[in-house]
Regions:
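Short strand-turn-strand beta-turns centered on an Asx-Gly dipeptide
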Residues: 6-9
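Immediate flanking context of iron-sulfur cluster ligation sites
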Residues: 22-59, 86-90, 117-126
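Short, structural beta-strand-to-alpha-helix junction motif
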Residues: 17-21, 67
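Fe-S ferredoxin-like electron-transfer domains
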Residues: 57-168, 185-238
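Cys/His-coordinated zinc-binding microdomains
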Residues: 35-38, 49-52, 65-68, 132-142, ...
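Extreme N-terminal starter segment of soluble prokaryotic enzymes
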Residues: 1-3
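Short metal-binding segments enriched for Cys and/or His
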Residues: 238-257
């Protein structure tokens, strides 16, 4: 274990972890968008900036990419850090005027309005802040790579290749799950899952043989079975709830006999 000082108070930390992980563990509030515990550090949104006041490299840096070392001293509320954070939040408000999650985050850190756009809380505009979590989860975690950054500058966006229906997307919904801005729309309708945001890429859903509920896309099931060895074939046909009930009915009698 090593010792780091955050806002003049000492904390224990594990060698090699990132400062943002320590901040989160210790309940020290700091905003972030591109960080997610399932993904590698990215340092893109810049919101998790802290000031390093003691240690090898003093200055302002992103805590999600700052590896803690023994004796590191950081301040999360230094005046310059707070100033940069507020300007960034104003920019995100302007970039994603339709995202309630971003409005809430900005409000939490003292920003109600943006100087960079006519900010209207009722606006239903763009919700994406280009943090890239969806791109990275699709690539890094699933190994699918159905979406990526497209275009440049003010036209930057995240999309499927050629802005069309994706043949790669498996409809797992991980992208929507990790999106901090609520920018990805998915509609389940009957036996279909429609990835609205990904140009209405449509996937067939599988029906549970026991409950008759539609529970996952056929492509997701194939993907899982292609990665995991020795999964019983019959589990392909049943929802998570039915799987749990099956396991409970297999194991509970043994325990109840004890
Ligand atoms: S739903 Fe499609 S785009 Fe989203 S993470 Fe899964 S495979 Fe990638």
């Amino acid at each position: 274990m090593i010792t780091v000082t955050i806002n003049n108070k000492k904390y224990e930390a594990n060698e090699g972890e990132y400062a943002l992980q320590v901040l989160k563990r210790e309940g020290i509030e700091i905003p972030y968008l591109c960080y997610h515990e399932a993904l590698s550090p990215y340092g893109a949104c810049r919101l998790c900036m802290v000031e390093v006041t003691g240690g090898a490299r003093p200055g302002i840096t992103t805590s999600c990419t700052l590896v803690v070392t023994d004796g590191l001293e950081i301040q999360t509320e230094a005046p310059e850090v707070v100033r940069i954070r507020k300007v960034l939040l104003e920019m995100y408000l302007a970039e994603a005027p339709g995202s309630e999650a971003i409005q809430e985050l900005a409000r939490k850190f003292g920003v109600e309005r943006s100087r960079f756009a006519d900010f209207d809380i009722e606006a239903k505009g763009d919700r994406c802040v280009l943090c890239g979590r969806c791109v990275r989860v699709c690539n890094e975690v699933l190994g699918v790579g159905a979406i990526n950054y497209a275009s440049r500058g003010t036209k930057s966006n995240i999309n499927t290749p050629w802005y069309g229906v994706s043949s790669a997307c498996i409809g797992c919904t991980a992208c929507a799950y990790v999106c901090p801005a609520g920018a990805i729309d998915i509609i389940d309708s009957g036996d279909e899952r429609i990835m609205e945001t990904w140009n209405r890429t449509t996937l067939k859903l599988k029906e549970c043989v026991e409950t008759k509920e539609f529970f996952a896309t056929e492509k997701v099931i194939d993907h899982v079975y292609s990665k995991a060895l020795d999964l019983p074939e019959d589990l392909k046909e049943v929802s998570a709830g039915s799987r749990m009930r099956r396991r409970a009915s297999e194991f509970l009698p043994k325990y109840l006999r004890k």
